[in-house]
Amino acid sequence: MNYNSINLVKTHLINYPCPLNINFLWNYGFLLGIIFFIQILTGVFLASRYSPEISYAYYSIQHILRELWSGWCFRYMHATGASLVFFLTYLHILRGLNYSYLYLPLSWISGLIIFALFIVTAFIGYVLPWGQMSYWGATVITNLLSGIPSLVIWLCGGYTVSDPTIKRFFVLHFILPFVALCIVFIHIFFLHLHGSTNPLGYDTALKIPFYPNLLSLDVKGFNNILILFLIQSIFGVIPLSHPDNAIVVNTYVTPLQIVPEWYFLPFYAMLKTIPSKNAGLVIVIASLQLLFLLAEQRNLTTIIQFKMVFSAREYSVPIIWFMCSFYALLWIGCPLPQDIFILYGRLFIILFFSSGLFSLVQNKKTHYDYSSQANI
């Protein structure tokens, strides 16, 4: 057993063969793993002093911040880590879209399942501080599920956000990261089943071991992200936080604008630019499903050969518009829903889905041997 464990570490962490020409864009997975581990540690420490009851939830957060030794540090590190996880996740997906990672369907789908778990975990975690923005944000999102009354009752423990809601959200927020951690190991297994891609898109026999060559590249990226993480945790959390969330919940007063965290803004833009809440919810779910469909591009291209090339590095035009429309929706989700933003939001939603569906029928030139996952 001891020998098998050592052999597993040597195979997947030390002697794992990597392409010689990969660059810093391949650091995001390693950085995500480190930040996610920090999130779990800080979350466990915070959970030990948090009270999931509506009369004490807000005050338990204030107790952690003001009275517990270094409690403010753990609280701000946890808040900053959530933003950093999504920032690195978006970059990780962006790199996958650009460098043919979607041709590995099992790796791609397992990664998107982790992304979906991150979304659910972050949302229910945003409710736990029980400030004004947390309460009303939870009310708005749970009202979207009113088309399925039994689901609302099961999730909230009633027809409105109340004490059973925060208890259930706390339990889910504690459990889901460990579920995501299990899928992370599955994701790594599927990745190592074939091997890492590279910027050129050529499967080459010229490879080097992960240690010490590429580990030094990952450590360099970790040093940079650690500096950013600590500076933001210590100095930058308060100016970027919502002031309304520092106020005790008042169920009779609605904030001027209910705005989620920045990493939810693209999906929030889809919700607020569509007049029907059920249609908005369907569009949000469809936007995530579209990413899953990209894994089937490998199969669809055997039927339809439609290639659109942009620049010498062969980025496809649909994928570029797909990414640009996503970041445009991120910007549109922040301001008040005025007519001009609603118009642009709908236009970018159309562009988002049309470019994503267009990319399904393009044929990107690749020289990889995907036989390990070709018949899955």
Curated annotation (Swiss-Prot):
Binds 2 heme b groups non-covalently. It comes from the Eukaryota. It is found in: Mitochondrion inner membrane. Pfam families: Cytochrom_B_C, Cytochrome_B. Heme b b562 binds at H78, H173. Heme 1 (or BL or b562) is low-potential and absorbs at about 562 nm, and heme 2 (or BH or b566) is high-potential and absorbs at about 566 nm. This is Cytochrome b. It comes from Plasmodium berghei.
